[in-house]
Amino acid sequence: MNYIEKINNLLKPKQGGSPLVLDLFAGCGGLALGFEAQGFETLGFEMDNDCCATYKKNLNGDCIQAKIDSSYQFPRAQVVIGGPPCQPFSVGGHQRGVRDARDGFPAFISAIEQAKPEIWMFENVRGLMYKNKNYLEAIVAELEEMGYIVEYKLLQAVQYGIPQNRERMIVVGHRGKFEFPVAQKKKVTAGDALGDIAHLIHITE
């Protein structure tokens, strides 16, 4: 089995039915894909029409097209995940942080408060841990007041079976039963991922 077949098999959505996962700022459903592969039911929230359409096409779960904020009414769910807009904290987005109108954390915190999940997680750029660390600590403090144990860690994609150097900060809130995955020693190369495609002859004429 080559890498592409392995990934397609691993991430193939499974019919589960429960528990429910709310996927905020869902994009095309990259985070939800992993949860559906483990049998979870997902419900995405995304303001971009094309992203929502892609979500519905590739996943079993529905996607609600909406621009969410702290006043949005969310349903109860066992899990909440999301990728709050990272432009406020990324180098490419000029790192305006909490002064940026694109900040999605008020909506994410509101969803946690309403849904009361057993566990939640969000991913973001490493800039949130450094230049905007005070804001991260404020977010953590607010979520800890809701009774969650909050842990965060920088994870490098290439150490988890992905042929890409991509570092992201993963933040998890739980009730006492969670461990970050152990990094893999063996790395997947671009050649492994592309398979026979990597050996095709480039024709210029």
Question: Can you say where each PLM-predicted feature lies in the sequence?
Answer:
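Core alpha/beta nucleotide-donor-binding catalytic domains of modification enzymes
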Residues: N2-K116, R126-M129, N134-E137
